[in-house]
Amino acid sequence: MTFAFIQAEKAHHPVRTLCRALGVSASGFYAWQVRAPSARAIADGVLTERIRQIYGASDGIYGSPNIHAELRDEGTRVGRKRVARLMRVAGLRGVSRRRSFVVTTRRDRAQQPAPDLVQRQFRADHANQLWVADMTYVPTWAGFVFLAIVLDVWSRRIVGWAIGEQMTSQLVLCALNMAIAQRKPKEVIHHSDQGSPYTSLAFGQRCAKLGVRPSMGSVGDAYDNAMAESFFASLECELIDRRSFETKSEARLALFSYIEGWYNPRRRHSALGRISPVNFERSRATNTPFQEPIDIPQPA
């Protein structure tokens, strides 16, 4: 500790003066400076390099909790505080969610919304028990594209999605059709807001035909559809805020890659024990048939 203090203060005071004041030799200090690093320092260096690799593989998204989880799954025994310290020293920071609620809901007062069957209780005991759905927009230099998603509350997996250039009932129907085709639920609650695409006659008829029970929260209250909003918050800070899309095609490809290449198969969730939605489903022994994603026609 004495030599470390001298190292910190030598820019302000002569080394020999500091050594004399602290009762140590200057030669001892200089020998300390060139001494081989400790085993702990070497281990920290090796660990920091692996942390950098994991951080880079996450495209700079992961903070210390998820990087710690990656190391744990690799068999590396290390404390979370040590990971956080090494990331701080290396200048590595994960992204932070700062999404402000943006109202995209446009209610059609001529249509009667479905009752709220969820009442903000976003819990499910198994797959295909409760789905939440919502829409958002993504800016590009050529205008907006709109994304509709269906998320399984049990595993946080995006089971249906669609991208279009208008916020229509056809857009949400495409997302619902994809979810039905992949999951084949026997009985599921589909919870959304009261936006006109969800209260439309076409959407209601499709739900009735498929045996889907529609549920709708209030207008303009993010807490009534908090889980869908949470996904969009992640999408915003991890993709939209970090990219500028020149074309709508570029945005479509980025959204596809984010959902099917990152979020579902790889992105770790604290609510799932720091594993991804796909790995969470694989870790649970169920009789639910989980199929690989299939191609669903997207609206123009």
Where are these regions (language model features)?
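Charged DNA-binding/catalytic regions of mobile-element recombinases
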Residues: 1-300
